[in-house]
Amino acid sequence: MAELQNDRFLRALLKEPVDQTPVWMMRQAGRYLPEYRATRKQAGSFMDLCRNKELACEVTLQPLERYPLDAAILFSDILTIPDAMGLELRFQTGEGPIFDKPIKSMSDAKKLFVPDMASELGYVMDAVSTIRKALDGRVPLIGFSGSPWTLATYMVEGGSSKTFAKIKAMMYDQPATLHHILDVLADSVIAYLNAQIEAGAQAVQIFDTWGGVLTPRDYKEFSLNYMAKIVDGLKRENDGRKVPVILFTKGGGQWLESMAETGCDALGLDWTTDIDDARARVGDKVALQGNMDPSVLYASPDRIREEVATILEKYGQGTGHVFNLGHGIHPEIDPEHAGAFIKAVTELSPKYHK
């Protein structure tokens, strides 16, 4: 593998000194880019795009051709694991992901298995190694997975949900069933992320998109415990270099201390937590990633720059901050505005690293 030319993203995650604050965007390869929309059309369906290593590589690199980003993130979907378990994933226009075989009972849950990474999910690893080769050491490649709780919400609800009624009913009425599902998912995520690391991912992120819908007690029992199990099972070094792990619970600002205890290297923050408060609470233990509201990108480039300046000032001097949005970039954002965001971080952050 080619020598890494820009490692400031990895260094910041490990709280090592950097020359400026590294920056990337969740969903940076996505629908806001016209070139992504063209490749997506060429692929046919969304999952066909994920399964074609050349096209997945192409869309992963597209934002790097436009912007001076400090990391690339694998183009894939969090639902690849449940799909490989035989739940038959499809995407319905306007509705999002749908599973034709949702899990309703313990007998359904008992049929779940840890997918074979080479045969069932080999297309993901092929994409990782193809992208890593194409990057040729420009920037590190991030691998990722959904958290067990977040994956389970889709598997039990049969798709997206606003109320999470089915999974919460299972959680309160059949907790043993839900724990069984989460256990199999945690083992699957460990195998999945380790396979991505073997294939060339240089950092990994666990996306707990729906952890924030839980009570504090339920969050610990049904989400955090399983993420801690994953962190514990991950390969933390490859090619003689540490592989940092980022945990991101959307809406998880109240639980940062507990999250920092898992042994992860960094915590993702959404925009509902002040980064200065987060640093005061857990900055001695972990790096922080975030946390501009993605909706700021609808505003003018001057307003975007102001917001970037505020967040940099709130975090303050020194390393341990990776600049990002507080969640994925919205599909309607003007690519020029995303560019103004990246430019502001690269121009305004060096003074915090002197």
Curated annotation (Swiss-Prot):
The record marks 77 as: Transition state stabilizer. Gene3D superfamilies: 3.20.20.210. It catalyses: uroporphyrinogen III + 4 H(+) = coproporphyrinogen III + 4 CO2. Pathway: Porphyrin-containing compound metabolism; protoporphyrin-IX biosynthesis; coproporphyrinogen-III from 5-aminolevulinate: step 4/4. Keywords: Cytoplasm, Decarboxylase, Lyase, Porphyrin biosynthesis. One of its GO terms (biological process) is protoporphyrinogen IX biosynthetic process from glutamate. GO terms for cellular component: cytosol. The keyword Lipoprotein does not apply. It is found in: Cytoplasm. InterPro entries: UROD/MetE-like_sf (IPR038071), Uroporphyrinogen_deCO2ase_HemE (IPR006361), Uroporphyrinogen_deCOase (IPR000257). Belongs to the uroporphyrinogen decarboxylase family. Homodimer. This is Uroporphyrinogen decarboxylase. It comes from Hydrogenovibrio crunogenus (strain DSM 25203 / XCL-2). The gene is hemE.
